[in-house]
Regions:
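Local sequence-structure signature of Cys/Sec-based thiol-disulfide redox active-site neighborhoods
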Residues: 1-24, 28
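Generic recognition of short, well-ordered alpha-helical segments
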Residues: 17-20, 45-49, 69
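Structural micro-motif
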Residues: 51-57
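Thiol-based oxidoreductase modules, predominantly thioredoxin-like and allied folds used
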Residues: 32-44
Length: 81
């Protein structure tokens, strides 16, 4: 099971797009991943680290995407891990 973390913040339209993509893929089923959303503004260290990079997606602890991600690219990255 792959672990996916989406670093995001309120009011970020690109974050909303990536979140919708992950939710759609999760709902579709058949993929071996779980995901969680983390608000970078909830932690000063995360805010400093990702302030200008959200959304950022990590798969199994490794940065896979920042700013944009589509279904096809996510599926490729998931299979490559």
């Amino acid at each position: 099971m792959h672990e996916v973390v989406l670093y995001t913040r309120a009011g970020c339209h690109l974050c909303d797009q990536v979140k919708a993509t992950l939710a759609r893929l999760e709902k579709r089923g058949g993929l071996s991943f779980v995901w969680q959303e983390v608000d970078v503004d909830s932690d000063p260290e995360l805010q400093q680290k990702f302030n200008h990079e959200v959304p950022v997606v990590f798969i199994d602890g490794k940065k896979a995407f920042k700013y944009r991600m589509d279904e096809r690219d996510f599926l490729r990255a998931l299979v490559a891990r």
